[in-house]
A protein has these predicted regions:
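Membrane-embedded alpha-helical transmembrane segments of multi-pass integral membrane proteins
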Residues: 30, 34, 59, 99-102, ...
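Membrane-helix interface and helix-disruption motif detector
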Residues: 39-55, 104-121, 161-177
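N-terminal topogenic module of multi-pass integral membrane proteins
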Residues: 1-77
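Internal transmembrane alpha-helix with an interfacial aromatic "cap," most often the third helix
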Residues: 62-87, 100-109
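Alpha-helical transmembrane segments of polytopic membrane proteins
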Residues: 22-26, 51-60, 92, 115-122, ...
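Membrane-proximal helix-loop-helix units in multi-pass membrane proteins
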Residues: 86-148
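Terminal transmembrane helical module of multi-pass membrane proteins
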Residues: 132-202, 211
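Juxtamembrane helix-loop boundaries in multi-pass membrane proteins
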Residues: 5, 9-30, 79-98, 141-151
Length: 211
C-alpha cells in the first residue's frame, strides 16, 4: 500500500511539473515572438497602442493555439495547483497580490523604469507564489523559483546593458527586458520538463526512504 501511494504521489508530481513546463515554454515563446514583432513594427512604421495589443494577442493566440493539444492535457493539473491559492490566509493572498501587481502599478508613476519594473513584477510575483505554495500547500515548485530568480537577476543586467548600449533607445531596452522574461520562463519550463522527480519527501542522498 505504501509503495502504491508513493508511486501515485510521484506520478502526480511529475504530471503537474510537466504541465507547468509546457505552459512556461509556451509563455516564453509567445513573449519573445511578440517582443520581436512589436519592435520590428515600431521600427518600420511606428505603432499606436492598439497595434501592440493586436500583436501580443495574436502572438499568444498563435503559440497557445499551436500548443493546444499539449496545453489541453496539462490544463487540469494547472488548474488544480492554482486552486490551492484559494485556501491561503487573507494576508497571504494580499501579500501575493501586492508582489504581482505592485511593480506593474508603479509603472504609472515611474514610466522611465518600465523595463525594470516588468522584470521585478514577474520575479517578485513568481517568488511570492512559490513561497506561499511551499508554505501552505507543502509543495515545492522549483521551476517557478527559477523563473523568479532569473527575472530578478536580469534587473541589474538590464540596467547595465541599457546604460552602456541602449541609453537613447528605450524601445530596444524594453524589448530586451521582455526577452529576459522569455528566457526566465524558458529556463523554468525546461527544468520542469527535463527534471526527474522523486516522491514527496524523497532525499536522494539517503537510502531512499521517505523522510
Amino acid at each position: 500500500i505504501s509503495c502504491s501511494c508513493t508511486t501515485g504521489i510521484t506520478k502526480s508530481t511529475v504530471e503537474v511539473r510537466r504541465a507547468f513546463g509546457v505552459l512556461f515554454i509556451a509563455v516564453s515563446i509567445a513573449v519573445v515572438i511578440a517582443s520581436c514583432f512589436s519592435e520590428i513594427a515600431y521600427f518600420i512604421i511606428g505603432l499606436q497602442l492598439y497595434y501592440y495589443v493586436i500583436i501580443w494577442l495574436a502572438s499568444f493566440g498563435a503559440v497557445f493555439g499551436a500548443s493546444y493539444r499539449r496545453l489541453r492535457k496539462a490544463l487540469p493539473a494547472i488548474l488544480n495547483r492554482l486552486k490551492t491559492s484559494t485556501r491561503w490566509p487573507t494576508a497571504a493572498k494580499i501579500f501575493n497580490g501586492i508582489c504581482w501587481a505592485g511593480p506593474f502599478a508603479a509603472i504609472a508613476a515611474f514610466p522611465s523604469l518600465y523595463q525594470y519594473l516588468i522584470l521585478a513584477g514577474i520575479g517578485l510575483g513568481n517568488l511570492s507564489t512559490y513561497l506561499m505554495i511551499k508554505k501552505y500547500s507543502n509543495t515545492d515548485n522549483p521551476e517557478q523559483l527559477i523563473v523568479a530568480l532569473v527575472s530578478l537577476a536580469a534587473v541589474p543586467a538590464a540596467v547595465i546593458i541599457d546604460n552602456m548600449v541602449f541609453a537613447t533607445r528605450q524601445d530596444i531596452a524594453i524589448m530586451l527586458s521582455r526577452i529576459f522574461i522569455g528566457i526566465a520562463y524558458a529556463a523554468g519550463g525546461m527544468f520542469a520538463l527535463l527534471r526527474k522527480a522523486g516522491p514527496v519527501g524523497f532525499d536522494p542522498t539517503t537510502s531512499g526512504s521517505l523522510q
